[in-house]
Every structure is written in C-alpha cells, then in structure tokens.
C-alpha cells in the first residue's frame, strides 16, 4: 500500500516479496493466538462431560500448553506460512491495483475515504480466492477433535479430496469472501482516515513514518476484526464440517449460519474468540503495514525512485 496517493505502484514481483516478508513476520509472532481463537470458536454451547472446554483465551492457552505441549500452539502453521506470501501479496497488490482502477473509473485525482473502503472490500474479495484451501487445512489441523485424523498438511489435503472430492477444498468460500471483504474494508478504510488525522511524518524521518504506520495499521486491524468476527466464527464452523453425500450441513451458508448461531447460542457466540483474534490482528495489522511499507521503501530506494 503506497504511503501517498500519487506514488506509482511497484511491479507485482516487488509487491509479492514485500507482502511475503510482512505476512511471514506477522504469522511467526502472532500465530499462537490464532490457534486459541479457532479452538474457542469451534466450541458450541456449554461444557460437555468428557470433552475439553475453554473458559476464554487464557484458560485455553493454559490447557493447550499443559495437556498438549507448547508445540501444539504452532500446529498447522505450515499452511498459513505457505499461504502468507500469496495472501499478503494479493492483499496489498490488489489494494493498490484496485485503488488505481477506481480512481480512474470515478475520475478522482486522489484516494478518498469512500474509495479506500471500496478498494479494500474489492481487494478482500480478490484475496479470498487465494486463501480458502489453506484456511480449510489450517482449521482441520487446529481443531483438537480432529487432531488424530491427520498427519500434517498434505495428509489433510489427501483425505479431504478422497472423502469429499476436490471441490471440497473450497468449502467455505462464500463465508471467506464476506470475512475478507469486511476486514479489508475496515482495515484500509481506517488506515486512510487515521493517516489523515496523524501528524505527517517529516520527509526522510523513518521513525515518524513507522510510528504512523504502526498506529494506523493497529487501529485498522482492530476495526476490521470488530467487523468480521461473526463471519470468522461461521467460517470456522463451515470449514470444520465434513461434507456427507445427500446430507445438508448444519453450517452451510454464511448468513443462515449467523442466524443459527444466534438462535442456538445467543449473539455473544458470534464474537467467540474475539479477544485472541483482536490481540493478534490489531497489533498484527500494525506489523503488516510497518514491514510492508519498509520493504517497499527499500525497493524504491534500490530502484532510485
């Protein structure tokens, strides 16, 4: 994402590398919170005798480390690590590309708040098509109930395709579309607005630029998380449900699934896992923006721009 509206986007290869570095940096720091978030989101109702139940984020962290070992907090990380390069490259490259497209379409010389939200939403939809198979694998590996079924990422893919067919790898596409549209519109929309409100960084002052990016990215990540958590909850449920021929899954489409969760578990259930999610994606959004901007600035200097 360019620091200003007149800066020409770099070629896709540079976007890809910068997005990959930013994404992998964020995932290595924040991944355990994603595991906790998924475990909490997959819980339905109240505790059942004989089944592990988590009373919030810290209880979940404690029980995972105590009962399964610290390494379990990084179970399933191979899928997101492999996903981060194309995912983050698509996020930022699509945002820059769609931004230029919409400015040209509407005859706008500079980015506006409305265009920032529209651009972010479209970039989120674009990104969704890249991430669905990786998200599906990650969810299956993170769920404790299916931990013994799979021996790593490739085994998950093999067993899903064998049991449910190749199209099952895109199970949850619709809910993922909604999740990413909401998060990206909130993220990039807030970044635009917060940057406009912050004191402008002095030319060449990297510490001020980093400060502004960290603040804008963290606020943007928090706003995106507030907007998209209900869709993330139902996405986790949809992707953790194996397809059975002739049987309609309980969680199938995003908005009906939202209604089902609200009816059976109450509105608060739509925000299960919110604390670990916002603690990850709030600061994580800041990390993403700081690293991405830093790598892109490095490439611009290297190219003499």
Swiss-Prot record:
<protein>
    <recommendedName>
        <fullName>Mitochondrial citrate transporter D</fullName>
        <ecNumber>7.-.-.-</ecNumber>
    </recommendedName>
</protein>
<feature type="transmembrane region" description="Helical; Name=3">
    <location>
        <begin position="118"/>
        <end position="137"/>
    </location>
</feature>
<dbReference type="InterPro" id="IPR018108">
    <property type="entry name" value="Mitochondrial_sb/sol_carrier"/>
</dbReference>
<comment type="function">
    <text>Mitochondrial transporter that mediates citrate export from mitochondria to cytoplasm. Both ctpA, ctpB, and ctpD play important roles in citric acid transport across the mitochondrial membrane and function in a redundant manner.</text>
</comment>
<dbReference type="InterPro" id="IPR002067">
    <property type="entry name" value="Mit_carrier"/>
</dbReference>
<feature type="repeat" description="Solcar 3">
    <location>
        <begin position="211"/>
        <end position="298"/>
    </location>
</feature>
<keyword id="KW-0813">Transport</keyword>
<comment type="similarity">
    <text>Belongs to the mitochondrial carrier (TC 2.A.29) family.</text>
</comment>
<keyword id="KW-1133">Transmembrane helix</keyword>
<dbReference type="InterPro" id="IPR023395">
    <property type="entry name" value="Mt_carrier_dom_sf"/>
</dbReference>
<feature type="transmembrane region" description="Helical; Name=6">
    <location>
        <begin position="270"/>
        <end position="291"/>
    </location>
</feature>
<dbReference type="GO" id="GO:0005743">
    <property type="term" value="C:mitochondrial inner membrane"/>
</dbReference>
<feature type="repeat" description="Solcar 2">
    <location>
        <begin position="111"/>
        <end position="197"/>
    </location>
</feature>
<keyword id="KW-0472">Membrane</keyword>
<keyword id="KW-0812">Transmembrane</keyword>
<feature type="repeat" description="Solcar 1">
    <location>
        <begin position="10"/>
        <end position="101"/>
    </location>
</feature>
<dbReference type="GO" id="GO:0055085">
    <property type="term" value="P:transmembrane transport"/>
</dbReference>
<keyword id="KW-0677">Repeat</keyword>
<feature type="transmembrane region" description="Helical; Name=1">
    <location>
        <begin position="16"/>
        <end position="36"/>
    </location>
</feature>
<keyword id="KW-0496">Mitochondrion</keyword>
<feature type="transmembrane region" description="Helical; Name=2">
    <location>
        <begin position="78"/>
        <end position="98"/>
    </location>
</feature>
<feature type="transmembrane region" description="Helical; Name=4">
    <location>
        <begin position="176"/>
        <end position="196"/>
    </location>
</feature>
<keyword id="KW-0999">Mitochondrion inner membrane</keyword>
<keyword id="KW-1278">Translocase</keyword>
<dbReference type="Pfam" id="PF00153">
    <property type="entry name" value="Mito_carr"/>
</dbReference>
<dbReference type="InterPro" id="IPR051752">
    <property type="entry name" value="Mito_2-oxodicarb_carrier"/>
</dbReference>
<feature type="transmembrane region" description="Helical; Name=5">
    <location>
        <begin position="208"/>
        <end position="228"/>
    </location>
</feature>
């Amino acid at each position: 994402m360019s620091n200003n509206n007149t800066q020409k986007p770099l070629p896709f290869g540079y976007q890809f590398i910068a997005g990959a570095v930013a994404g992998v940096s964020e995932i290595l720091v924040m991944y355990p919170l994603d595991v906790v978030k998924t475990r909490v989101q997959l819980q339905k109702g109240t505790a059942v005798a004989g089944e592990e139940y988590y009373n919030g984020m810290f209880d979940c962290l404690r029980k995972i480390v105590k009962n399964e070992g610290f390494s379990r907090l990084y179970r399933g990380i191979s899928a997101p690590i492999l996903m981060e390069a194309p995912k983050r490259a698509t996020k930022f490259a699509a945002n820059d590309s769609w931004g230029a497209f919409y400015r040209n379409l509407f005859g706008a010389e500079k980015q506006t708040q409305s265009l920032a939200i529209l651009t972010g939403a479209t970039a989120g939809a674009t990104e969704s098509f890249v991430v669905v198979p990786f998200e599906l694998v990650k969810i299956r590996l993170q769920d404790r109930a299916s931990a013994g079924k799979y021996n790593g990422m490739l085994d998950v893919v093999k067993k899903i395709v064998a049991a449910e067919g190749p199209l099952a790898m895109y199970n949850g596409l619709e809910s993922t579309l909604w999740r990413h549209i909401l998060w990206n519109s909130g993220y990039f929309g807030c970044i635009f607005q917060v940057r406009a409100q912050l004191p402008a960084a002095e030319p060449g002052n990297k510490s001020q630029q980093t400060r502004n990016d960290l603040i804008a990215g963290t606020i943007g990540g928090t706003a995106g998380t507030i907007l998209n958590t209900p869709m993330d909850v139902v996405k986790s449920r949809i992707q953790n449900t194996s397809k059975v021929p002739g049987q309609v899954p309980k969680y199938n489409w995003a908005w009906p699934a939202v209604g089902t969760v609200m009816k059976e578990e109450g509105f608060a259930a739509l925000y299960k896992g919110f604390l670990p999610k916002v603690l990850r994606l709030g600061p994580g959004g800041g990390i993403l923006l700081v690293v991405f901007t830093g790598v892109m600035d490095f490439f611009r200097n290297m190219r003499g721009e």
